[in-house]
Design a protein with these regions (language model features):
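Low-complexity acidic/polar repeat-biased segments
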Residues: 1-5, 123-169
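Disulfide-bonded cysteine-rich modules in secreted/extracellular proteins
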Residues: 6-15, 160-181
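Short intrinsically disordered, low-complexity coil segments enriched in acidic
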Residues: 1-9, 217-219
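Acidic, glycine-rich calcium-binding repeat modules characteristic of RTX/beta-roll
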Residues: 12-16, 20-118, 130-146, 176, ...
Length: 219
């Protein structure tokens, strides 16, 4: 069976792929796209869309609007560009050999992105905008669970791996930060602002520095 291309109407559509390499495009409206098996390209286009990659090496492109992207099994790529809103990724894949990635569009470098940890979620915010990506449960089990993403890629060739991301989200800003440790001996420094530091497991050193800070040692 050959690869299929399906395009939606201007309304709220539900499109389903087959066990081949499908291309599904949502067009206007708040659409639901399900690639099923195969190496699929899912494009939400405009609207608040829901994209399910299914099994296979899928590319999920939310487009404009606040979209939900579910990659599932396979080496999946989530693409994001300026002005595309606030997307949420749930990347549940138990394959230990997978390489799942976020790819930012032209003109976006690593210096344009602010990385934060919100509980177990990874939040990537495009500076000077309201655009952001939330990767649900990324830090579950210290970023070793099924929900992790292996790479964050930029068009200039720079790639952030898991270890780099784990380090970056522990760096304080001049504002009010929430910093989290891992199940190792962490050193967290709040810097300026009214900060909250969470050591979690391990023999940690928590330094509030300036501001009215709250420090939680953990186990």
């Amino acid at each position: 069976m050959k690869a299929l291309v399906q395009k939606a109407t201007d309304g709220n559509d539900r499109l389903y792929g087959y066990a081949v390499a499908d291309t599904l495009s949502g067009g206007l409206g708040n659409d639901s796209l399900d690639g099923y098996a195969g190496n699929d390209l899912l494009q939400g286009d405009e609207g608040h869309d829901i994209l399910y990659g299914g099994a296979g090496d899928d590319t999920l492109v939310g487009g404009l609007g606040n979209d939900y992207l579910y990659g599932e099994a396979g080496n999946d790529v989530y693409r994001f560009d300026r002005g595309w809103g606030q997307d949420t990724i749930q990347n549940n894949d138990s394959n230990t050999n997978k390489v799942d990635a976020i790819e930012f569009g032209s003109g976006i470098s690593a210096n344009d992105i602010l990385l934060n940890r919100d509980s177990d979620n990874l939040v990537l915010t495009l500076k000077n905008s309201t655009d952001r990506i939330t990767v649900s449960s990324y830090f579950s089990q210290d970023a070793t669970s099924n929900y992790r993403l292996e790479e964050i890629r930029f068009v200039d060739g720079q790639v952030l791996n898991i270890d780099t991301v784990k380090s970056l989200v522990q760096q304080a800003t001049d504002g009010n930060d929430r910093l989290f440790g891992y199940a190792v001996a962490d050193t967290l420094s709040g810097g300026l602002g009214n900060d909250s530091l969470y050591g979690y497991a391990g023999n940690d050193l928590l330094q509030g520095d300036e501001g009215n800070d709250t420090l939680y040692g953990g186990a």
